[in-house]
Amino acid sequence: MSDKPLTDVTFSSFDLHPALIAGLESAGFTRCTPIQALTLPVALPGGDVAGQAQTGTGKTLAFLVAVMNRLLIRPALADRKPEDPRALILAPTRELAIQIHKDAVKFGADLGLRFALVYGGVDYDKQRELLQQGVDVIIATPGRLIDYVKQHKVVSLHACEICVLDEADRMFDLGFIKDIRFLLRRMPERGTRQTLLFSATLSHRVLELAYEHMNEPEKLVVETESITAARVRQRIYFPSDEEKQTLLLGLLSRSEGARTMVFVNTKAFVERVARTLERHGYRVGVLSGDVPQKKRESLLNRFQKGQLEILVATDVAARGLHIDGVKYVYNYDLPFDAEDYVHRIGRTARLGEEGDAISFACERYAMSLPDIEAYIEQKIPVEPVTSELLTPLPRAPRVPVEGEEADDDAGDSVGTIFREAREQRAAEEQRRGGGRSGSGGSRSGSGGGGGRREGAGADGKPRPRRKPRVEGQAPATAASTEHPVVAAAAGQAPSAGVADAERAPRKRRRRRNGRPVEGAEPAVASTPVPAPAAPRKPTQVVAKPVRAAAKPSGSPSLLSRIGRRLRSLVSGN
């Protein structure tokens, strides 16, 4: 981005709807950024655009102005039903979709346009009811929208006049391109439909998508001297893994009160780093895939209001978040992808402001540094890790932000957030029948809290299954010895009393030469067994030593042959 973020081109110089111009002026937008000044002359007459610009340069406002102006000055298609949407804006992440919807409502609330926000992780039926009532503009992530289009036939895109693909390169990274193509084929042909595509990088695959589904798009590129924003001061430290948390605390203590984002590579480290910061008195929010969507929105809103000092996030929040006033971005872990580095540090120094991007190159992730420096075409200045930086400064008492007391509660602690997230995830799996330990269909019988399993003992412990008897086979010796009545009844149909007797716990009695061992307890059945008509004596089992089978007289053993051979050799000498 150039040092001059605004151009001399004004919004009033375009042929915009008067109500739209009034809304822009009331929101404080009078002059265009470079990407807006390039996009609007092409998009307002109805041309397709493939635009490339860095994050934070005003791409969102550029396509929102084009969409709203078209819907205000042009009539809908003749075959459109009142509930069919006229415009579709697709974003790769929930956070970006939420931000676009917030900006759209801000500018279009007084224009009579109806907006719908569609994304996963929230109430399905409520979104479906909103779509069935009819909207003008749908702002969505691809997955949830396809569910409404394909499975439930809630939305029809046959009358969609204009489609916007924001962060198209991120769509590829997240595997949404098949979904995008599916949705584009449900819209009017590209000669009738206007398509606006925006991306931080116009790679070969992005341009291939543009030329396949767009009508001779005009490629617009905002020229920049470097890949990263010019007003971002970058520096990098080389700490060990053990020094990273201490170094982070030391640097944070030297920038008290500044709005800060900390990026890590894994969801597990989001919780670990956030807990450490919270223990040292910082008010921390977290954004990761483990945090429920509603809680993410609440934490993001509090961070934007200044009620949270630090936001710890994975790359799910690296793109599309329009948060004003972020002064510091920490790469606690260097990202694997160089493009993710650019988008992370793009959270600061937006629209001409200044900011700092501080990265830690530990032994685990330092291998990513050469690729990052090659991608941004510059060397990142290296700062030494000194003992002074590893010593956090004492923190000054923090002044609460207005409205903080009403929103602050114990439920927003990091530990509580992740514990509730795990409990919610476990409850959802239980409702879907996904857990092994559930009472329904459980084999182990543990965790479900149900009754005793069939075939278990009175103490609840499992007993081994009996092998089925073969016709004519003699009863097992143990059964005959221990309880003649049970052994006699084994060949007949089992009755309830016999089955209960078999399940009753009992101590096995050893016998020597047919006599019980002295002191052994007799077996006690849980259910009385009827007396036999003719009692039999217990079978005696006598162990006898096993003798080797006699060898035939005609074939001497191996030892005999060896001995005979040795004697012949000795006598021969």
UniProtKB/Swiss-Prot annotation:
Which domain of life, per UniProt? Bacteria
- The short sequence motif called DEAD box sits at 166-169
Q: Which InterPro entries match?
A: DEAD/DEAH_box_helicase_dom, DEAD_box_RNA_helicase, Helicase_ATP-bd, Helicase_C-like, P-loop_NTPase, RhlB, RNA-helicase_DEAD-box_CS, RNA_helicase_ATP-dep_RhlB
| PROSITE patterns in UniProt | DEAD_ATP_HELICASE, HELICASE_ATP_BIND_1, HELICASE_CTER, Q_MOTIF
UniProt keyword annotation of Nucleotide-binding present: yes
Record's compositionally biased regions (Acidic residues): 402-411
Q: Name one GO cellular component term.
A: cytosol
Biological process terms from the Gene Ontology for this record are:
RNA catabolic process
Q: One GO MF term, please?
A: RNA binding
Q: What is this protein called?
A: ATP-dependent RNA helicase RhlB
Native organism is Xanthomonas euvesicatoria pv. vesicatoria (strain 85-10) (Xanthomonas campestris pv. vesicatoria)
